[in-house]
Amino acid sequence: MTLPILLGWFLTLCSSHIVRSCLQCDQVIRYVHEDFLSTVKGIRVRDQIELKKIIDHAYTNYRETSKLLSGVIDPTTLYRARTEYQSEFKRHWKEDRTNSLQWDLITIVEKGKRILQKHLEIFIAEGLCPNKCGLLYQRVMNCTSCQYGLFTCLSAKPPLDCGEHHLEADEGEEVVLDCFLSWHTLVVGQTEYHYSWHPGETNVLFDGEYEELVVTKESKIVLNQLSVSEEGSYRCLLKDQKGTALSRTFFQLEVKPFPSTSPRQVVTLPSLPLGYENTPYSLQKSSFLTVLILLTVLSITGSLIIIEYLRKSLKRQEEARGRDSRTAGDIELNTE
C-alpha cells in the first residue's frame, strides 16, 4: 500500500468519525508525537515529512470536529484521556507494529481518537454542568483556542433555588443545617455560605426580610438548645469571591415545645364534725395551753425535788464528817 493511498484513507477516516476531544491542546501529547518523529531512523526525508503531515492533519481535524459538540473539556478529563493515550502509544510501538510505519501511525492515531472520544462523552454526560440547580461558572478548556475559561451553567429550575427541607426538633435539642451540593467543589475561587433566618413559615425572597446569622466557609451550622422562638424559615446562600449568589436553599424548622406540666391534683378532705374548726393535725388552742402549763409545772416540780435531794445529801455528808471528827478527838484524849 503506497503512502498516498494510506494518507487518503486516513483523511477519509478522520472525516467520517467525529473526534470529540481536545487532543491538540495537550502539550504532553505533542511532545510524545515530536519524540516519536525524532527517533524514527532509516527513512527518507520525504517519508518523515509525510508522517509529520499525518499528525498535523490530525490536530486540525480534532480542532474542527470538537466544535460539533460543546467544544470544551475539563482538566480532569483531559488528563485521563492523555494518560491512557500515552500508555497505548508506547505499547503499540513495542507490541503491535508492522512493517509499514505509516500504517502503524494511522492505527495508533485512530485508537487514540476512540480513547479520547470515550472520555469526552463521559464528561459531556456527567461532568459538564453537573449542577441540577443554581448557577455554576465551570472552569473548562476551549478546544478551539486551547485556553481555559469559565463556562456558564444555568439550571432548568428557577434561578438559584436548590430545594426546601422541612425539619422538626423538640425544644432543647439541636438541629444541623447543611446546604452542601457536590458541584459546589467546582466553583472557582473562595466561597462562603451565608445563613439567615426569618420567623415566618413561608420563604421570603427579599433579603431585607431575613436576619443574618453567620457567614462561614463550612456548608453546615448547628443550632443548639432550640427554643420555640427559633422556628421559622432558614436560608443558605452560596456566594463566590465576587459576592455572586450561586445557590439558595431553604430550611423550614418547626420546634415542638416541652409537654406542659399537669397541675397537681388537690385532694379535698371531708368536713370535720361540728366543734372541730382546726385541721386534724393541730391541737385546739385551749388544749395546747393546758398541756404547756402542765409541762411547765412538772418541770418546776422536778427541779425542786432534785434540789431538795441534793441539799439533804450534802447535809448528811457534813454530819458524817462532824461525827468522824469528834470520834477522832476522843481517841486522842484516852491515849494521854
Curated annotation (Swiss-Prot):
Q: Which residues form a coiled coil?
A: none
Q: In which tissues is it expressed?
A: Expressed in sperm.
Disulphide bonds annotated for this chain are C179-C236
Q: Where in the cell is the protein located?
A: Cell membrane; Cytoplasmic vesicle, Secretory vesicle, Acrosome membrane
Any one biological process term the GO annotation gives: sperm-egg recognition
Gene Ontology cellular component terms for the protein in this record: acrosomal membrane; plasma membrane
Source domain of life: Eukaryota
| Resulting phenotype, K111E | Loss of interaction with bncr
Example GO molecular function term?
signaling receptor binding
Q: How does it sit in the membrane?
A: Single-pass type I membrane protein
Q: Where is the signal peptide?
A: 1-16
Q: Which positions fall inside the Ig-like C2-type domain?
A: 158-247
The membrane spanning regions, by residue number, are 287-307
Q: Which UniProt keywords apply?
A: Cell membrane, Cytoplasmic vesicle, Disulfide bond, Fertilization, Immunoglobulin domain, Membrane, Signal, Transmembrane, Transmembrane helix
Task: Describe its function.
Answer: Essential sperm cell-surface protein required for fertilization by acting as a ligand for bncr receptor on egg. The interaction of the complex izumo1:spaca6:tmemt81 with bncr is a necessary adhesion event between sperm and egg that is required for fertilization.
Q: How does it assemble?
A: Forms a complex with tmem81 and spaca6 on spermatocyte cell membrane. The complex binds to oocyte protein bncr.
What more does the entry say?
A: Izumo is the name of a Japanese shrine to marriage.
Which family does this protein fall into?
Belongs to the Izumo family.
Name this polypeptide is given:
Izumo sperm-egg fusion protein 1
- Tell me what organism the protein belongs to: Danio rerio
Corresponding gene? izumo1
